């Protein structure tokens, strides 16, 4: 079963499908360090460019015109998330007037093109739950190309992810993966990391910063910032017996037992990445790749559901 991944990021979504023995034909991603991460771990070809400059027909040729069974992908969520204090007030403006929001339309163009080549195509588009504010418009756009769509909100922690993460998965099938019996908490996620693991370098902090974070209790944060409608937190001290909060691109977490930030590897553990999944780019770029991805364990749960349909 063949998959293409649009707006692939570092490859968390693709990794989940690989783990269920799907074949990744190719991906589109436009940021070089992220592409390097994807190529190293997923080992599938990537067209590195802005999707606006890649017509579906050209990408079809790039993957040698092979049959596409599944399209996955995660158009940028910034235009739709309330964490963005510059989010446009009119929901439709987020789709049509925000140049980043318009990337969703390119995803739909790809679905349209590959549907014409395979009537049984399945697609899954990931975004933040707030994208439901343009639900009717998305129903119309997908309906115009022959697809009834379902708006599936899935919580990654229900499938074994150690951090909370509610996301919308818009698809032409209902997605109801089997949930795990027991949640995975921070302490369990962070244990037994080999000292020589990749991406496991500890960031040196100033004495003043160490003193500040030493005074924090579990569940407290050093910094706060204003989202569109609510206060957001960063440098959050993790509670060892609970789930971690949602991992975002700029999220930084404090170790529950040590006065330091989590390493990139530890943060990747919170998003269910295996230790042999290596991240490239500067440290901030690595953190960002993790926070902007679909946890592989959730991607795999979705892949299992799709297998039933195919």
Curated annotation (Swiss-Prot):
Name the domain of life.
Archaea
Q: Where is the active site?
A: 77
**What GO annotations for molecular function exist for this entry?**
DNA (cytosine-5-)-methyltransferase activity; DNA binding
Instruction: Give every SAM-dependent MTase C5-type domain span.
Output: 1-310
* Any Pfam family hit: DNA_methylase
Under InterPro entries, the record lists: C5-Methyltransferase (IPR050390), C5_MeTfrase (IPR001525), SAM-dependent_MTases_sf (IPR029063)
Q: Which PROSITE patterns match?
A: SAM_MT_C5 (PS51679)
GO biological process annotation, one example? methylation
| Broad enzyme group | transferase
Quickly give the catalysed reaction: a 2'-deoxycytidine in DNA + S-adenosyl-L-methionine = a 5-methyl-2'-deoxycytidine in DNA + S-adenosyl-L-homocysteine + H(+)
Q: Which SUPFAM superfamilies match?
A: S-adenosyl-L-methionine-dependent methyltransferases
Q: What is its EC number?
A: 2.1.1.37
**The entry's keywords:** DNA-binding, Methyltransferase, Restriction system, S-adenosyl-L-methionine, Transferase
The UniProt entry's sequence similarity note says: Belongs to the class I-like SAM-binding methyltransferase superfamily. C5-methyltransferase family.
Q: What does this protein do?
A: A putative methylase that may protect DNA from cleavage by an unknown endonuclease.
Q: What is this protein called?
A: Putative type II methyltransferase M.MJ0563P
Organism equals Methanocaldococcus jannaschii (strain ATCC 43067 / DSM 2661 / JAL-1 / JCM 10045 / NBRC 100440)
Its lineage reads: Archaea, Methanobacteriati, Methanobacteriota, Methanomada group, Methanococci
């Amino acid at each position: 079963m063949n998959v293409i991944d649009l707006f692939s990021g570092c490859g968390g979504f693709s990794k989940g499908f690989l783990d269920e023995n799907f074949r990744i034909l190719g991906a589109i991603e436009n940021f070089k360090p992220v592409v390097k991460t994807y190529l190293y771990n997923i080992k599938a070809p990537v067209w590195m460019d802005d999707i606006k400059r890649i017509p579906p027909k050209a990408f079809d040729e790039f993957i040698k015109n092979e049959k596409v069974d599944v399209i996955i992908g995660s158009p940028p969520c910034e235009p739709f998330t309330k964490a963005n204090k510059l989010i446009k007030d009119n929901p439709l403006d987020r789709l049509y007037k925000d140049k980043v929001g318009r990337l969703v339309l390119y995803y739909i163009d790809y679905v349209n093109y590959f549907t014409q080549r395979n009537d049984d195509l399945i697609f899954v588009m990931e975004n933040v739950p707030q994208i439901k504010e343009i639900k009717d418009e998305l129903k119309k756009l997908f309906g115009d190309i022959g697809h009834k769509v379902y708006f599936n909100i899935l919580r990654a922690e229900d499938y074994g992810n150690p951090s909370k993460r509610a996301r919308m998965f818009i698809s032409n099938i209902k997605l109801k993966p089997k949930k795990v019996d027991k949640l995975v908490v921070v302490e369990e996620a962070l244990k037994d990391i080999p000292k020589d693991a990749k991406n496991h370098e500890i960031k040196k902090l100033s004495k003043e910063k160490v003193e500040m974070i030493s005074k924090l209790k579990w569940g407290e944060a050093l910094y706060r910032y204003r989202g569109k409608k609510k206060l957001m937190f960063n440098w959050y001290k993790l509670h060892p017996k609970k789930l971690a909060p949602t991992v975002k691109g700029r999220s930084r977490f404090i170790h529950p037992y040590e006065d330091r930030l989590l390493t990139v590897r530890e943060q990747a553990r919170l998003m269910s990445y295996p230790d042999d999944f290596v991240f490239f780019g500067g440290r901030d770029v690595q953190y960002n790749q993790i926070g902007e991805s679909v946890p592989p364990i959730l991607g795999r749960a979705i892949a299992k559901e799709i297998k039933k349909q195919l």
